[in-house]
UniProtKB/Swiss-Prot annotation:
Catalyzes the ATP-dependent conversion of 7-carboxy-7-deazaguanine (CDG) to 7-cyano-7-deazaguanine (preQ(0)). Zn(2+) binds at residues 200, 215, 218, 221. ATP binds at residues 12-22. One of its GO terms (molecular function) is ligase activity, forming carbon-nitrogen bonds. Pathway: Purine metabolism; 7-cyano-7-deazaguanine biosynthesis. Belongs to the QueC family. It comes from Nitratidesulfovibrio vulgaris (strain ATCC 29579 / DSM 644 / CCUG 34227 / NCIMB 8303 / VKM B-1760 / Hildenborough). Keywords: ATP-binding, Ligase, Metal-binding, Nucleotide-binding, Queuosine biosynthesis, Zinc. HAMAP family: QueC. InterPro entries: QueC (IPR018317), Rossmann-like_a/b/a_fold (IPR014729). This is 7-cyano-7-deazaguanine synthase.
Length: 242
């Protein structure tokens, strides 16, 4: 049974983090809608993966299908026009002079959250959920707790609303994110995240590792692999299976 009285909108990309957050929300809210974005990303694979996850997640736990609401996809191609990044253009993945990786898309999460709030406003939804994290992350400033708290204030002032921005992964390591998936949906949910979610910056979907699909060498794959290895090792110490 949901533990929160209300509906939620999850910013859902089809990646590990947002998939885990979707399961978290389905356990807590009466109806959980989703929103995704075409922002000019180089690879369409993540948009296909989000559809695969949405098609399968309702069968993970009894009741999840009944709580899953509508899905909205918004076009945000302006990010390709604003400048080159490794996620929107064919450029090398490397650290920039400002200390941020070339995969950083300036303003992306801020724009996503603003668009999600506008969508939620029209649907009478108060709770916004997204999978940003300040622990195991690439250093993106728009993933930090301070940025999310500031956005909640700005959105509530600008729309005269009482939105609550939920960031369930904010202080979790990637290993703890795998633990959350197991806690929220059991081993079936862990398997769904492994098989259907997408993380790889290079869009590789034809190479399967123990931790899922990907090139295995980009920063996103390395982080996902390290988290999975720590998760498996932690459960092995306690004599548990995956």
């Amino acid at each position: 049974m949901p533990s929160c009285d209300g509906n939620a909108l999850v910013i859902f990309s089809g990646g590990q983090d947002s998939t885990t957050c979707l399961g978290w929300a389905l356990n807590r809210f009466r109806t959980v809608a989703t929103i995704g974005f075409h922002y000019g990303q180089r690879h369409d694979v993540e948009m296909q993966c989000r559809q695969d996850v949405l098609a399968a997640i309702g069968d993970v736990r009894p009741g999840w299908k009944a709580h899953l609401g509508t899905d909205t996809v918004v076009e945000m191609g302006l990010f390709r026009e604003l400048g080159e990044t490794a996620l929107t253009h064919d450029v090398a993945i490397e650290m920039g002079r400002n200390g941020l990786p070339s995969t950083f898309v300036p303003g992306r999460n801020l724009m996503f959250l603003t668009a999600a709030a506008a969508c939620a406003y029209r649907q009478g939804i108060r709770h916004l959920v997204l999978g940003v994290c300040e622990t195991d992350f690439s250093g993106y400033p728009d993933c930090r707790d301070d940025a999310m708290k500031a956005m909640q204030v700005a959105l509530n002032l600008g729309m005269e609303s009482r939105f609550v921005v939920h960031t369930p992964l904010m202080w979790l390591t990637k290993a703890q994110t795998w633990d959350m998936a197991r806690d929220e949906g059991g081993q079936d949910f862990v398997e769904l995240v492994l098989e259907r979610s997408h993380t790889c910056y290079k869009g590789v979907r034809d190479v399967r590792h123990p931790w899922g699909y990907g090139c295995g060498t980009c920063p996103a794959c390395e982080l996902r692999r390290a988290g999975w290895d720590a998760y498996v090792a932690g459960h092995a110490v306690h004599g548990e299976g995956r």
